[in-house]
Amino acid sequence: MSDEKSWFQEIHFLFPEGKDKALTFSYDDAQVYDRRLVSIFDQHDMKATFHLNSSTLDREGFVTRSEIKQLYVNHEIACHGVTHPFFNQLSQAQTVTELYEDRRALEQYSGRIVRGFSYPFGVYSDNLIETALKLGIVYSRTVNSTMDFALPTDFMRWNPTCHHDQVTDELLADFLNPPPFRGMALLYIWGHSYEFERDGKWAHIHGICEKLQGRKDIWYATNIEIYDYVTAVRGLIMSVDGHILYNASARPVWFMTSGKMYCLAAGEQMSFD
């Protein structure tokens, strides 16, 4: 083999518009405190994913079916099981029903395609993952904090950076001031909106948003937007010598090579001499 360094060894993929950081939030259970949390996110131009249990909608203390289309208009709606069950205590038939009916109901109420999921109580198994994939789920969030900013290797075992209680000034400083070798960095924060009310910590989420808002180097995205983009990056087709790159996906992909940034459009092929 040639000792010459291949072009593809120098490529550095980036988030949309050439940004090197991404931020996403994920909140479960759809209690009425989602209304206040959504307002805070919208005020600061944040993007989040809200995981809903379709059977609790309209119950006291929870958001209503009629409001979710407008309430979450700037955010993603995702599954959390019809009844928030312990999936390790269900039969296979119950597992299918919990996933399928939750997805069906949420799509009906929201008018959108629902593809995301988060594991109630953080409980999951290989069988649950296999079943979810067959039912059209493409990613699912755990409750296992990594305390880092790495992209997930397995979107069906998507470990977040941390719960919002674990967000510190030191963590944010590490995210915002990366070493040059880090590459694409994702800060993924999760929790429940009722925790801010219960613990008297609404100022905490306000502070997080204020420190992270309006930055030109951050892509503010929902969970499904992260999934779709990273999947597009990982699906790029490259020639053996690394001089031809083809984007077979339906979305543009950004990268840098030899000190120059490129945007490879959907369906585009690019050659480098």
Regions flagged by a language model, labelled:
Residues M1-R35:
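Boundary/entry segment of secreted carbohydrate-active catalytic domains
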Residues S6-F15, E107, Y139-D148, F181, ...:
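C-terminal domain-boundary segment and adjacent tail
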Residues T24-F25, E76, I218:
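Hydrophobic "anchor" residues on beta-strands that sit immediately upstream
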Residues Y27-A30, G81, S193, N223:
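Active-site metal-binding loops of divalent metal-dependent hydrolases
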Residues I40-M46, I208-K211:
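A short, Lys/Arg-enriched amphipathic alpha-helix followed by its capping loop at the start of a domain
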Residues D42-V138, N144-W158, C162, M184-S193:
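Metal-dependent polysaccharide deacetylase catalytic core of the NodB/CE4 family, i.e.
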Residues Q92-T97, D169, D199-W202:
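Non-membrane alpha-helical structural segments and their capping/turn regions in soluble enzymes
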Residues D169-P180:
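A short, acidic, amphipathic alpha-helical segment used as a generic capping/interface helix at domain edges
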